[in-house]
Amino acid sequence: MQQWSLLVVSFLLSPVPVSAIKELPKAKKYEVVYPIRLHPLRKRETQEPEPKETFETELRYKMTVNGKVAVLYLKKNNKLLAPDYSETYYNSSGNKVTTSPQIMDSCYYQGHIVNEKVSAASISTCQGLRGYISQGDEKYFIEPLSSENLDEQAHALFKDDSNEDQEKSNCGVDDALWLQGLHQDVALPATRLIKLNDGMVQEPKKYIEYYVVLDNGEFKKYNKNLAEIRKIVLEMANYINMLYNKLDAHVALVGVEIWTDGDKIKITPDANTTLENFSKWRGNDLLKRKHHDIAQLISSTDFSGSTVGLAFMSSMCSPYHSVGIVQDHSNYHLRVAGTMAHEMGHNLGMIHDYLSCKCPSEVCVMEQSLRFHMPTDFSSCSRVNYKQFLEEKLSHCLFNSPLPSDIISTPVCGNQLLEMNEDCDCGTPKECTNKCCDARTCKIKAGFQCALGECCEKCQLKKPGVVCRAAKDECDLPEVCDGKSSHCPGDRFRVNGSPCQNGHGYCLKGKCPTLQQQCMDMWGPGTKVANTSCYKQNEGGTKYGYCHVENGTHMPCKAKDAMCGKLFCEGGSGDLPWKGLTISFLTCKLFDPEDTSQGVDMVANGTKCGTNKVCINAECVDMEKTYKSANCSSKCKGHAVCDHELQCQCKEGWAPPDCENSATVFHFSIVVGVLFPLAVIFVVVAIVIQRQSARRKQRRVQRLPSTKDAKLHNQKCRPQKVKDVQPQEMSQMKKLHVSDLPSEEPEPPPDVLITKPNFPPPPIPVSLTGRAKVPFVKTPHPFSQQIGRVYLK
């Protein structure tokens, strides 16, 4: 047997007992390998050690892949199972038995090969290493060769054989019905692509709540071993989750059901019949007892032809058609998981890949031939299809992550799912990046108000009235924060009956159904509504014109209801995404589908059929009487309007609950309330500082005359030339004695400027007894050295 060298560790290689080697189906070539677990080097712990987990958050294994030593990096998938995960089987009496296993720790991992640009891994470590590894274009399966619960034991690593059962490898969805039909805009115009991308940026992460059913043949195939079946289903779900993570969608397994006592529906080789039967069972039975978004049936039945899977297109979130069926067509269950992911893609609006689609890897999920290789990514076409599906509001169930009150399992802090008694859950302390959440306790940190949600910003609640979800279109309403919760309220719509599309329609549950839009959805761009004469055919009561079907008979429409029966259009494409016949006569064009349960060929409820009249169940009825929405908004207090459930909703910018306080005014009042006292304090402080400054300046002016002022004084007060004083005149002047000086310093007259000396002067007398004016004498005064200059008045 030719072997590939996948792990060269000579001292670990040893003969494996034949009794310990499991029989690997059709695996004629495999290499016995011993994965080596690499333990990370850790710094000395400075904090309280974390609780030890049975399965670590991150793992690394060393092995040689494709002749080169490689390190496999794995990260635990903590959210593989939904919090309300349950398992259902039937006892010998046919009674349903449902359990909620407390699976406290996960042994399912996803990852890649370190330093490889294109690689992926989906691995279970529950009992050794079991799963799938890809490296470039090479794909491998790995399985333990013994039942020992060891990872460093003998494993078989074998290549994905693309030649296995190639003759039976196709999906049953017919592409010919889709390439030019509703989804003909796979190659969308640039403007449309920009719109889709812009819309996706704002969308939250998608949650696909997944339910798997196995028929009685599968139960027998796995020797009626429920534990083994659970292990296989969880490995498949882990692989599917790995694929859809690339679309920012999380696939959470909410339940597994095994028909242990017999099949609950008729399963035949006709895949279409089996799909219809499973669809009805799901809507009438399963959905009433278990909440989920999509259900798939895995069957051991060999479907006719090359079909191994079938699903309804663009039906995710539909109560009856969000289903798919998959044949257990391979000995390797992960190949079956690839088909399960493929059929789920159809439910999400994806068509098969064709030549012009760009695939990041060798094979993508939506390739029509499902057996050639294991898919590892989605093509460019699939991504555009998926974005379009989300844009068309067909995916409402994907945006509702499980509510804590809906969770019945034991809460586990660190699984990144918000459960009862948890404020937040950001993963383990190593994984957590939320600064508001304490990862050890799943509680909000002290001093903070919130940790997540549209109404939480920087760990604080946003103010009431702040818009947390803008209106998407004219039939939508904006949602505002209430100031109490960190989460945005549920999506609300304008009251049913509000005019839309420039008066061509009326809103109904957030949509604006019009004949024009339905014709374009059916036949594509360039389609328009047929003449009213075509709609008169609905009064005939034939297969090509009717309002109801009763006991197989096509019932005619009344004249007033003719616009509410069969849909008639003109122009557009000749191909449709549904099986059936296209019938044209004159300018009238209609569609006769094989499956009438979807009602795509009939005028939709809520379509305008006259002034204040809408179609409801193929009858043209009075809108206000039907919707009961007349004057609803007048009953709302404050700045509120009525929504589609006749409840009062605050207008944009107005704070709940009374809608009387504007968010803008509220914010302004807060700003004013804070800034006004600060402004008053600032003004008071400024006045005090100014007065103190003025006083200090006045003192300096009084005590320290400036040189500039002295110069001005010398210029103004320079005496005129007078004749010299004669000695006899001097003798007549009154003698000046020190005792004659005044005891107090009077204020200088305002017209007298003071000269600043070079040294601190003593008190300067400015006036003497007597009123006779004495001219300034240049001759030094006897006291001039003591008192400086003397100014006489």
Swiss-Prot record:
Cysteines paired by S-S bonds: C317-C397, C357-C381, C359-C364, C468-C488, C632-C642, C636-C648, C650-C659
SUPFAM superfamilies, alphabetized: Blood coagulation inhibitor (disintegrin), Metalloproteases ('zincins'), catalytic domain
Domain Peptidase M12B as annotated: residue spans: 206-402
Region (Disordered): 699-759
Active site: E343
Tissue expression notes: Strong expression in thymic epithelial cells and developmentally related tissues including the trachea, thyroid, lung and stomach, but not in lymphocytes. Expressed at high levels also in epididymis. In contrast with human is not expressed in immature or mature lymphocyte populations of thymocytes, lymph node, spleen, and bone marrow.
Cysteine switch, short sequence motif: residues: 169-176
Keywords assigned: Disulfide bond, EGF-like domain, Glycoprotein, Hydrolase, Membrane, Metal-binding, Metalloprotease, Protease, Signal, Transmembrane, Transmembrane helix, Zinc, Zymogen
GO MF annotation, one: immunoglobulin receptor binding
InterPro entries: ADAM_Cys-rich, Disintegrin_CS, Disintegrin_dom, Disintegrin_dom_sf, EGF-like_dom, MetalloPept_cat_dom_sf, Peptidase_M12B, Peptidase_M12B_N
Any Pfam family matching the protein: Pep_M12B_propep
Intervals, Extracellular compartment: 196-668
Binding-site positions, Zn(2+): C171, H342, H346, H352
Propeptide feature: residues: 21-195
PTM per Swiss-Prot/TrEMBL: Pro-domain removal and maturation may be, at least in part, autocatalytic.
Positions annotated as glycosylated: N91, N272, N277, N531, N551, N605, N631
Signal sequence annotation: 1-20
Ranges for domain EGF-like: 628-660
Description of its domains: The conserved cysteine present in the cysteine-switch motif binds the catalytic zinc ion, thus inhibiting the enzyme. The dissociation of the cysteine from the zinc ion upon the activation-peptide release activates the enzyme.
Name this protein carries in UniProt: Disintegrin and metalloproteinase domain-containing protein 28
The species this protein was found in: Mus musculus
High-level lineage: Eukaryota, Metazoa, Chordata, Craniata, Vertebrata
Gene: Adam28
